[in-house]
Amino acid sequence: MAKISQDVSSSRSKARKAYFTASSVERRVLLSAPLSKELRQQYNVKSLPIRQNDEVLVVRGSKKGSEGKVNSVYRLKFAIQVDKLQKEKSNGASVPINIHPSKVVITKLHLDKDRKALIQRKGGKAE
């Protein structure tokens, strides 16, 4: 199939380079997560960049089914840390587990005026 837009590259190496050299501002959009079915109906938006204090449900991986609040969004590592997901080190200390946002579903949004404005811009209905 032919390329429709001449401005977008189909090259795998260029796509990978763009992904791994993305700035923090660009990584925010790359760290988006889908909304749950209820939220999708409520706000008429499919996915949003994930933020601290959003509540998420893990839908893939060994921690599938776990729920919790997002403690931090680690843009440098393309990961989020959820409050209830921790592993214990051999010395007894507990460390947070990093999860990619595409492997979670947002179940409750942390809304403020900026987030509501973003939903409006995306064509959704912020209530």
Curated annotation (Swiss-Prot):
<comment type="subunit">
    <text>Component of the large ribosomal subunit. Mature ribosomes consist of a small (40S) and a large (60S) subunit. The 40S subunit contains about 32 different proteins and 1 molecule of RNA (18S). The 60S subunit contains 45 different proteins and 3 molecules of RNA (25S, 5.8S and 5S).</text>
</comment>
<dbReference type="GO" id="GO:0030445">
    <property type="term" value="C:yeast-form cell wall"/>
</dbReference>
<dbReference type="InterPro" id="IPR014722">
    <property type="entry name" value="Rib_uL2_dom2"/>
</dbReference>
<dbReference type="GO" id="GO:0022625">
    <property type="term" value="C:cytosolic large ribosomal subunit"/>
</dbReference>
<keyword id="KW-0687">Ribonucleoprotein</keyword>
<dbReference type="GO" id="GO:0003735">
    <property type="term" value="F:structural constituent of ribosome"/>
</dbReference>
<dbReference type="GO" id="GO:0042273">
    <property type="term" value="P:ribosomal large subunit biogenesis"/>
</dbReference>
<dbReference type="GO" id="GO:0002181">
    <property type="term" value="P:cytoplasmic translation"/>
</dbReference>
<comment type="function">
    <text>Component of the ribosome, a large ribonucleoprotein complex responsible for the synthesis of proteins in the cell. The small ribosomal subunit (SSU) binds messenger RNAs (mRNAs) and translates the encoded message by selecting cognate aminoacyl-transfer RNA (tRNA) molecules. The large subunit (LSU) contains the ribosomal catalytic site termed the peptidyl transferase center (PTC), which catalyzes the formation of peptide bonds, thereby polymerizing the amino acids delivered by tRNAs into a polypeptide chain.</text>
</comment>
<dbReference type="GO" id="GO:0030684">
    <property type="term" value="C:preribosome"/>
</dbReference>
<keyword id="KW-0963">Cytoplasm</keyword>
<dbReference type="Pfam" id="PF16906">
    <property type="entry name" value="Ribosomal_L26"/>
</dbReference>
<comment type="similarity">
    <text>Belongs to the universal ribosomal protein uL24 family.</text>
</comment>
<keyword id="KW-0689">Ribosomal protein</keyword>
<dbReference type="GO" id="GO:0003723">
    <property type="term" value="F:RNA binding"/>
</dbReference>
<dbReference type="InterPro" id="IPR005825">
    <property type="entry name" value="Ribosomal_uL24_CS"/>
</dbReference>
<protein>
    <recommendedName>
        <fullName>Large ribosomal subunit protein uL24</fullName>
    </recommendedName>
</protein>
<dbReference type="InterPro" id="IPR041988">
    <property type="entry name" value="Ribosomal_uL24_KOW"/>
</dbReference>
<dbReference type="InterPro" id="IPR008991">
    <property type="entry name" value="Translation_prot_SH3-like_sf"/>
</dbReference>
<dbReference type="InterPro" id="IPR005756">
    <property type="entry name" value="Ribosomal_uL24_euk/arc"/>
</dbReference>
